[in-house]
Swiss-Prot record:
Quaternary state and interactors: Part of the 50S ribosomal subunit.
Protein name: Large ribosomal subunit protein uL1
Segments passing through the bilayer: none
Keywords: Repressor, Ribonucleoprotein, Ribosomal protein, RNA-binding, rRNA-binding, Translation regulation, tRNA-binding
């Protein structure tokens, strides 16, 4: 394991890795650690009480964070005709069909989110090996395959984040930047937790949200007392 910097060592000494911190204190600690020369992301890891190996317990979805992500998002949309015009009007940077597919095949992936109208999947479907590994393949489960491309574009621009449980049963997501006010980070975290609760598989038994931990890009994890999340 790589040695921690003196800054991280000093911060780590303040954090009890076994303690559950009230959300206010957890956010304060995480923001205190985010002292790098750039505006660090504030990330969350949620351990779910599911069996990720079972297909009926895969947790996946999306949520629009009320305070946004602090990131400028470039959106590409596969659409034609009226839907293409709607996508452009909603703010999509790139809109196309076969021409856009050719750009993707050529390696021109200068976008962060890909949205597709259902009638374009015959074209988009051929791009799975390129878009899939990068987490860019449109999927109806996260709202990126939809006839309402305009709303999907607006959601992406407004701070929508996608989530999917990994093989260890953990959800990883970014809920903002270190420059955000604690109230903004808290509202974003609450929105994510609510979305995860709605996405709970019917076959999941026992405690569903097992652990929640916050960290900054260059920081260490701080565990959150879930009982303090709902309280305002």
């Amino acid at each position: 394991m790589a040695k921690l910097s003196k800054r991280l060592q000093a911060f780590a000494s303040k954090v009890d890795r076994q303690k559950l911190y009230a959300i206010e204190e957890a956010l304060s600690l995480v923001k205190e650690c985010a002292s790098a020369k750039f505006d660090e992301s504030i990330d969350v890891a949620v351990q779910l009480g599911i069996d990720a190996k079972k297909s009926d317990q895969v947790v996946r979805g999306s949520v629009v964070l009320p305070a946004g992500t602090g990131k400028s998002v470039r959106v590409a949309v596969f659409a034609q005709g009226e839907k293409a015009e709607q996508a452009r009007a909603a703010g999509a940077e790139i809109v196309g069909m076969e021409d856009l597919a050719e750009q993707v095949k050529a390696g021109n992936l200068n976008f962060d989110v890909v949205i597709a109208s259902p009638d374009t999947m015959r074209v988009v479907g051929t791009l799975g090996q390129i878009l899939g590994p990068r987490g860019l393949m449109p999927n109806p489960k996260v709202g990126t395959v939809t006839p309402d491309v305009a709303t999907a574009v607006k959601n992406a621009k407004a701070g929508q984040v996608q989530f999917r449980v990994d093989k260890a049963g953990i959800i990883h997501a970014t809920i903002g930047r270190a420059s955000f006010e604690p109230t903004a980070l808290r509202s974003n975290l609450n929105a994510l937790v609510e979305a995860l609760q709605k996405a709970k598989p019917a076959t999941s038994k026992g405690v569903y949200l097992r652990k929640i931990a916050l960290s900054s890009t260059m920081g260490v994890g701080v565990r959150v007392d879930q009982a303090t999340l709902a309280a305002q």
